[in-house]
Amino acid sequence: MKNKVVVNSSFKDIKNFINIPSLRKGVIEEAPNSPINANYAVNSTANFLHPSIQYLIVKSVVDISRDTKAYILGPDASLGTAKLAYFRPGQFISVTLEIGHAVVTRPYTLCSSPLRSLDDEYVILVKKDSNGFVSPFIHNTWVKGTKVKASAPFGNLFYQPLRDSKNIVGLTDEYGISSFLSMAEAISDGTLDTDLTLFYSARKKNEAIMMDRLNELASANNKFRVIYVLSDERADKCERGFITKTLIEKYVSATRYSVFVNGSTPLYNRVTPQIAELKLEQKYIRYGLSGQIKNPASLPDFPKDAVGKTFLCKVIKDGETLGKIPCSSEETLLVALEREGIAVQSVCRSGECGFCRSKLTSGNVFIPKDVDSRRLADSSFGIIHPCYSYPMSNLTLIIN
């Protein structure tokens, strides 16, 4: 007996299949031609967390010491910033300023807890450098009501549970205290679940800014403690000398911990060999922004024949030559560009973030090896970070 296959169908199925193109065309023609104005939640969240610009306003100013002020910043709704972007303890914002003809940026670490940003307040500390360019301007001009343009929060000096130990050892001085003050505040209010042991280096006790607040936080929470290390005087409840491997081991009993470092270049130079002696895995060692080198000619590999020389830099942007600007061998190309009023995207000013990434088409630059964070391909194709590149000859630079 032959096998029989029975197919149950109808002519309507075939007819409908044939009619699909005409039905589709009719639906398209009947649809409204106005664009869909969809506001997807994921895009709204991304724009809130990572805005290209935050328009802020100074809410109040607090004198911290003879040369340090705290600025409490809030969102400037009149210019489009309704809420402040959230951040992680240890991150910074980059502030853009117009000072005379120059357009400059400076990163300032947020010293408040992220919880405070939910109440629309950032707090930054600005220490005045009498020989500086930006900090005196801020001290002299920023008052309640001053409008400020800033970036979203950036930076990698924050606790990441997939990478870091819950036991954090912080090494700092008055130039890097904001990162750890933010962490201590976050530990206190429950935003950050870590243990922080902070070694605070200073010449004298009265130079350790924010000491009273740090002591308050340490007294109220056993997950945070601070050890003051004074180099130039003896004081009660303070260590004398510098931060060393022996001193760290005296106060840290944990077998596994992360070391976070943030502060001045001299601090980095002193503690780096001490950290090496701790024999920690590299992932447990984190450095904050190193900042610009104030005396690059003092570096051992800086070309001595270039000291004191001035060169010309031809600047090109979007195919247009903006002109030739003078640049000293002992200042970064970014500083030279800003001084001439040429706006360049920059955030960290430490050779890390890559926002100022530019192409060097001719000439030579000096880049300190310890802070050269460029990709290998960038190094091969003449890509440099002007914020940490020093001219060694006349050159041509294409900026973004």
Identify what each model region corresponds to.
Residues 40-147, 202-204, 215, 231-233:
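Ferredoxin-reductase
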Residues 308-345:
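C-terminal accessory/binding modules appended to enzymatic or scaffolding proteins
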Residues 1-15, 136-308, 312-317, 322:
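FNR/FR-type flavoprotein reductase catalytic core
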Residues 1, 17-26, 373, 384-400:
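Rossmann-like nucleotide/phosphate-binding core characteristic of flavoprotein oxidoreductases
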Residues 1-50, 277, 282, 305:
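Iron-sulfur (Fe-S) cluster-binding modules
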Residues 342-364, 370, 377-393:
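Local cysteine-cluster metal-coordination motifs and their immediate loop/turn environment
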